[in-house]
C-alpha cells in the first residue's frame, strides 16, 4: 500500500522563459504534516496551485493518491478537488455573508444535504476551531486570527484528505499564531488529515512538521525531519534556517566595481 498521498515526480514548470522548477521531486506522506520552506519568490504558492490542478507543468507527474493530476479531465479534477482543502494566505472569506455561511458554502456547493444537517456540520466545524459563538458575525467583525480560523473551518467543511496551508502564520500576533499552530496539529491528528504547510516561519512550522523540504534554485536543496535539517552542514540550509543576512545567498546584488561606477 502506497503511504504517500502526494508524489511530485520530475516536475518542470516555467512562467514565460523563467524556470520556476527544474526536475523537482518530493513526496507527502498520508496522515502527516509536511512543511515546504524556502526564500521568497521561489514558487512555493505556485507548487500548491500545481498540486491543486490550477496550473499545469511543462513536464513531470503530480500524483494524488495514485492519480496523475495532469492527466485528469475537468470532471475528474473537480471530483479530486473535493478531497482537498485550501487555506489561503489572505483567508479569502466572502465578505458579504456571515461566518456561518462562509463555512456552509462548500457544503452547499458540492453536496445535496438538507439544511438542518448542514447546520449541524457547520457548527461542528466552528466548534473545532473555537468559533461556534461567532457564527453570526460578518468577516469584517472578526480579528485577523479569528478570520484565519474561520477559513480553516471552511477548509475542513467537506472532511478533505488533504489541506494545503499557504503562509498560515503571516500577520498573526503570538497568541493567534500559537492557536493556529495548535489547531493544525490537533486537527491533523483528530481528523486523520494530510497537511502541507508553506511558511517562512521556520521555528513555528518545524515545531509541528513531521517532515520538511527546503526549496531553492528551482529544486529541493534539503529534506528531512526538523532535527535532521537543523543539523545540516549545507551552507544554504544554515543561512536560511538561521536567517543570516549574508552567505550563499548574497546580501549585495551583483554589480560592477563600486569605485569605478562612482567616478565614471
Curated annotation (Swiss-Prot):
Its EC number is 7.6.2.-. It is a peripheral membrane protein. It comes from the Bacteria. The keyword Protein transport does not apply. InterPro entries: AAA+_ATPase, ABC_transporter-like_ATP-bd, ABC_transporter-like_CS, P-loop_NTPase. One of its GO terms (molecular function) is ATP binding. ATP binds at residues 38-45. Its main location: membrane. Part of the ABC transporter complex MlaFEDB, which is involved in a phospholipid transport pathway that maintains lipid asymmetry in the outer membrane by retrograde trafficking of phospholipids from the outer membrane to the inner membrane. Responsible for energy coupling to the transport system. Belongs to the ABC transporter superfamily. MlaF family. This is Intermembrane phospholipid transport system ATP-binding protein MlaF. It comes from Haemophilus influenzae (strain ATCC 51907 / DSM 11121 / KW20 / Rd).
Amino acid at each position: 500500500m502506497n503511504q504517500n498521498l502526494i508524489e511530485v515526480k520530475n516536475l518542470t514548470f516555467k512562467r514565460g522563459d523563467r524556470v520556476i522548477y527544474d526536475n523537482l521531486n518530493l513526496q507527502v506522506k498520508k496522515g502527516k504534516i509536511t512543511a515546504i520552506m524556502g526564500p521568497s519568490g521561489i514558487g512555493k504558492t505556485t507548487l500548491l496551485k500545481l498540486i491543486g490542478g490550477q496550473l499545469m507543468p511543462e513536464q513531470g507527474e503530480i500524483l494524488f493518491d495514485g492519480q496523475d493530476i495532469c492527466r485528469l479531465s475537468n470532471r475528474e479534477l473537480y471530483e479530486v478537488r473535493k478531497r482537498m482543502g485550501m487555506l489561503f494566505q489572505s483567508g479569502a472569506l466572502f465578505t458579504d455573508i456571515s461566518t456561518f455561511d462562509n463555512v456552509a458554502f462548500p457544503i452547499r456547493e458540492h453536496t445535496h444535504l438538507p439544511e438542518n444537517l448542514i447546520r449541524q456540520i457547520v457548527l461542528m466545524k466552528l466548534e473545532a476551531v473555537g468559533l461556534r459563538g461567532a457564527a453570526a458575525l460578518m468577516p469584517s467583525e472578526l480579528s485577523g486570527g479569528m478570520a484565519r480560523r474561520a477559513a480553516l473551518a471552511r477548509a475542513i467543511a467537506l472532511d478533505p484528505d488533504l489541506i494545503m496551508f499557504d503562509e498560515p502564520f503571516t500577520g498573526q500576533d503570538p497568541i493567534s499564531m500559537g492557536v493556529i499552530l495548535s489547531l493544525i496539529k490537533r486537527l491533523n491528528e483528530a481528523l486523520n488529515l494530510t497537511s502541507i504547510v508553506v511558511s517562512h516561519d521556520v521555528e513555528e512550522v518545524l515545531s509541528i512538521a513531521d517532515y520538511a523540504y527546503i526549496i531553492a534554485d528551482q529544486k529541493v536543496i534539503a529534506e528531512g525531519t526538523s532535527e535532521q535539517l537543523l543539523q545540516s552542514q549545507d551552507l544554504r540550509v544554515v543561512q536560511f534556517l538561521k536567517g543570516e543576512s549574508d552567505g550563499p545567498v548574497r546580501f549585495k546584488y551583483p554589480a560592477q566595481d563600486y569605485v569605478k561606477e562612482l567616478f565614471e
